[in-house]
Amino acid sequence: MEYEDLFKKITAWAHDRGIDQADPRVEFMKMAEELGELSAAYNKEHHAKMVDSIGDLQVALLIFCQLVGVDHKEAIEAAYNQIK
């Protein structure tokens, strides 16, 4: 599946659950939780759990971006422009 299609599906999923109208602090805490899970999976060298945690972290980050009015594409582009 193409990234843009995934983004649209994630956006719809969040909307269907009302997450797109949630308090951004809640989604920020979700990102922290997922980062903790990723850290644990990495430390245990558990690849499948790392894949799951990375995916969950990306979903949470995309939703957080929407909640705080940051275009995720613009953000990654700006980051790339700083490192290139």
Where do the language-model regions lie?
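Flexible "arm" and connector segments at domain edges
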Residues: 1-54, 58-84
